[in-house]
Amino acid sequence: MSGRGKTGGKARAKAKSRSSRAGLQFPVGRVHRLLRKGHYAERVGAGAPVYLAAVLEYLTAEILELAGNAARDNKKTRIIPRHLQLAIRNDEELNKLLGGVTIAQGGVLPNIQAVLLPKKSSATVGPKAPAVGKKASQASQEY
């Protein structure tokens, strides 16, 4: 016979994705393809897409964690753009990173300037007791 076929020899191992090798959910192969296709550099190393996919996965997980907390605070089970906006703008580092980003349907942070808030007057606190040493007949000239 001519030696065709693979009756003997080692069986090929099951293919394992680079994402699973790195322990990531984000696609390392797709990130690598996009880095090559984007012409960011003439060549792309093997570790670069793994690192970039890990960074993207971490940032996504961080934002989704905070947005999930915002949704739970509002007694909702579904994350909407408003929850993403609240999560990002209330976190100092994420707000700095995504400062120039506009989130559609995100709204604004609730904020009322202190000067616009109603002043707490002494009348709302309660009637003042007369000071010790003054007689009740000597009323002050306060208006």
From Swiss-Prot:
Motif ([ST]-Q motif): 140-141
Documented effect of changing residue 137 to A: Increased genomic instability and radiosensitivity
Location of Phosphoserine modifications: 2, 121-122, 137, 140
Tissues of expression: Most abundant in testis, thymus and spleen.
Keyword hit for Nucleotide-binding: no
Cross-link (Glycyl lysine isopeptide (Lys-Gly) (interchain with G-Cter in SUMO2)): 128, 135
Effect of residue 37 to R: No effect on phosphorylation after DNA damage, but increased radiosensitivity. Further increase in radiosensitivity
Glycyl lysine isopeptide (Lys-Gly) (interchain with G-Cter in ubiquitin) cross-link, renumbered residues: 14, 16, 120
GO cellular component, one term: chromosome, telomeric region
Positions carrying N-acetylserine: 2
GO terms, molecular function: chromatin-protein adaptor activity; damaged DNA binding; enzyme binding; histone binding; protein heterodimerization activity; structural constituent of chromatin
Residues found modified as N6-acetyllysine: 6, 10, 37
Modified residues (Phosphotyrosine): 143
Comp. bias intervals (Basic residues): 7-19
Residue ranges of the region described as Disordered: 1-22, 121-143
Subcellular location: Nucleus; Chromosome
Record's keyword terms, sorted: Acetylation, Cell cycle, Chromosome, DNA damage, DNA recombination, DNA repair, DNA-binding, Isopeptide bond, Meiosis, Nucleosome core, Nucleus, Phosphoprotein, Ubl conjugation
Principal location listed in the UniProt entry: nucleus
Modifications made to the protein after synthesis: Phosphorylated on Ser-140 (to form gamma-H2AX or H2AX139ph) in response to DNA double strand breaks (DSBs) generated by exogenous genotoxic agents, by stalled replication forks, by meiotic recombination events and during immunoglobulin class switching in lymphocytes. Phosphorylation can extend up to several thousand nucleosomes from the actual site of the DSB and may mark the surrounding chromatin for recruitment of proteins required for DNA damage signaling and repair. Widespread phosphorylation may also serve to amplify the damage signal or aid repair of persistent lesions.
The family this protein is said to belong to: Belongs to the histone H2A family.
The record's note on its domains: The [ST]-Q motif constitutes a recognition sequence for kinases from the PI3/PI4-kinase family.
Subunit relationships: The nucleosome is a histone octamer containing two molecules each of H2A, H2B, H3 and H4 assembled in one H3-H4 heterotetramer and two H2A-H2B heterodimers. The octamer wraps approximately 147 bp of DNA. Interacts with numerous proteins required for DNA damage signaling and repair when phosphorylated on Ser-140. These include MDC1, BRCA1 and the MRN complex, composed of MRE11, RAD50, and NBN. Interaction with the MRN complex is mediated at least in part by NBN. Also interacts with DHX9/NDHII when phosphorylated on Ser-140 and MCPH1 when phosphorylated at Ser-140 or Tyr-143.
Note: Haploinsufficient for the suppression of genomic instability. This phenotype is further exacerbated in the absence of TP53.
UniProt protein name: Histone H2AX
Organism expressing this protein natively: Mus musculus
Lineage: Eukaryota, Metazoa, Chordata, Craniata, Vertebrata
